């Protein structure tokens, strides 16, 4: 007798969301572990109503991306201690009639950075003051870095800096010729450089130095103008895909209540992303 396959539903929600590599990455992970699940990309414009709709359709878990991470924190029925401290969630799980929230961005960011540098005692600069910046600031402080926030909106940047007891500088100061403060680690946490957005320059090329570690949270395109400028200056660059993978691993561990093995699962996630980005690069070269 034919029986329907029970498939759990997951999705990334945000706006824009068409650029997201999460479906490719997460579906590769599910296949590698023989987990009967499907992961979609869904544009969400009205988050309160959208969460109700997704609950009715039986979605088990959600990845939350721009611009909803702080709102998702406020809408979640319960959040864990880390998310409460950060004030943003990038992960939701349905338990009974409630949405439970946590944050894995900080785990993804710190793991990606620790692969190339120590963070304790380092001077770190975070560009941006949204949900991703909040998570990265939390993670960097937790690792013992001395964190400074730079943001165009002074009020929002100062509020974030106050929350985590960080320094704050207006973003415009970084382009001044006489700005001579040194940073060991720089993390770009805005949507600038995202595929399909209007090109914007955050900092001048002269800001970057040899020996800096520069990480991008945007992952499509793989090499943003921000990362290209850092690379030309001799900095060590960390792609946004590294953070994407490691925060995704933490999401899977939370949703599935099990460890996620490097092989075959994490390797499959990385390979799936690599294949998509390689095809895009080849198409551009043609």
UniProtKB/Swiss-Prot annotation:
Keywords: Amino-acid biosynthesis, Aromatic amino acid biosynthesis, NADP, Oxidoreductase. It comes from the Bacteria. It catalyses: shikimate + NADP(+) = 3-dehydroshikimate + NADPH + H(+). Shikimate binds at residues 20-22, 65, 90, 105, 219. NADP(+) binds at residues 81, 128-132, 217, 240. One of its GO terms (molecular function) is shikimate 3-dehydrogenase (NADP+) activity. Belongs to the shikimate dehydrogenase family. Involved in the biosynthesis of the chorismate, which leads to the biosynthesis of aromatic amino acids. Catalyzes the reversible NADPH linked reduction of 3-dehydroshikimate (DHSA) to yield shikimate (SA). This is Shikimate dehydrogenase (NADP(+)). It comes from Syntrophobacter fumaroxidans (strain DSM 10017 / MPOB). The lineage of its organism: Bacteria, Pseudomonadati, Thermodesulfobacteriota, Syntrophobacteria, Syntrophobacterales.
């Amino acid at each position: 007798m034919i029986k329907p396959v029970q498939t759990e539903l997951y999705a990334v929600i945000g706006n824009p969301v068409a650029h997201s590599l999460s479906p490719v990455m997460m579906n590769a992970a599910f296949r590698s572990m023989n987990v009967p699940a499907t992961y979609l990309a869904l544009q969400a414009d009205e988050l309160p109503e959208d969460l109700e709709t997704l609950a009715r359709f039986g979605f088990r878990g959600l990845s939350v991306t721009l611009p909803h991470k702080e709102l998702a924190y406020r809408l979640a029925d319960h959040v864990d201690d880390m998310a409460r401290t950060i004030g943003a969630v990038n992960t939701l799980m349905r338990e009974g009639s409630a949405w439970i929230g946590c944050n894995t961005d900080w785990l993804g960011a710190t793991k990606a950075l620790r692969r190339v540098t120590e963070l304790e005692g380092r001077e770190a600069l975070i560009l941006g003051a949204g949900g991703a910046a909040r998570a990265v600031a939390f993670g960097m402080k937790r690792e013992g870095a001395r964190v400074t926030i730079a943001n165009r909106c002074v009020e929002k940047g100062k509020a974030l800096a106050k929350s985590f007891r960080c320094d704050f500088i207006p973003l415009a100061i970084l382009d001044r010729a006489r700005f001579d403060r040194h940073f060991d680690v720089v993390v770009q946490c805005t949507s600038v450089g995202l595929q399909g957005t209007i090109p914007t320059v955050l900092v001048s090329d002269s800001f970057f130095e040899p020996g800096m570690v520069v990480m991008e949270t945007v992952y499509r395109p793989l090499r943003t103008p921000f990362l290209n400028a850092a690379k030309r200056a001799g900095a060590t660059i960390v792609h946004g895909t590294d953070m994407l993978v490691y925060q995704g691993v933490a999401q899977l561990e939370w949703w599935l209540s099990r460890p996620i093995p490097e092989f075959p699962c994490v390797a499959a996630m990385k390979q799936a992303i690599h294949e998509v980005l390689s095809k895009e690069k080849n198409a551009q070269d043609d």
